Amino acid sequence: MAINLKKIIEMYVLPVSMVVGFLAFLLFEKVQVLEQYRRPISNFVNPIIPACVCVMLYSAFCKVQLEKMKPRKWHLYLLMTQLVLSLVLVGIITFFKDFTYKEALIGALVCVVGPTAASAGVVASKLGGEESTISGFMLVSNAMCAVTIPLLLPLVNGRGESHFFLEFLNILRMVFPIIIVPFVLAQLTKLYFKRLHHFMLTEFKDLAFYVWSASLVLITARACSNAYHANLTLISALALLTAAVAVCIVHFGLGRVVGSFFNEKVNAGQAFGQRNMIFCIYVALTYTDPISSIVATLHMLVQNFYNSYQIIEYKK
């Protein structure tokens, strides 16, 4: 019974968390008595989101066995593809500065430059793939993001070249620890706190999943608030949705194409297609136009629905 309950929770946690987040947004937006608490609660929640990202990455890195991971050729090709796509989007955004739906392009950039999700290996294993090889890519993907995000985002913020270095340092100061500190702590836990490491792999093996669920509520509420106050037109909303779907298709499509040359279609598809959207949404909300975070939120929906479809088809 417990196993069935767990499966039910895993199946429906995405829509439930997003519905709860949406209802929380409505509650504090429409109930007049609660309006006075909206800003204090927002200020309280803001530091919780990056903390959740750190906990999720720490839990994922605790499961990674460095000694069993080997660099693969397709890792390099995917990283190069990610970098090229990021630079192309930066070029388009900077060239078409007055583009009406610029927020959609910036949202697409945040999705492209984002790291691989910790759950990519789990999904790949359910599709007949190999979890360890994706864990290796997840490490290098996160390491690259710690550098590329601070380098690229200041270029599209539109605040002039004189502010580039200051923005680079600011974003680096915030993003680098979120990615690197969990990895360092996970390695220290393995080396010096073996009982805690064993505990993380057994009793707390699903910690990242539940933290992800909780953070999804907070992220959804904040994204809904941003969309509501942005007064989006139908065309603008469609532009954001189109950007999210297009990036998701490109991610999974290119991943599978690159993987097909190395007989790693499933692994490469998941490694490149499934991104850490909680992290991407946090980056979009913090360092770009908040409307851009809607693209990452929609991307998260699309990638999860696509993976659910793949798993159902694979099990037939």
Language-model segments: what does each one mean?
Residues 1-316:
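Alpha-helical transmembrane segments of multi-pass small-molecule/ion transporters
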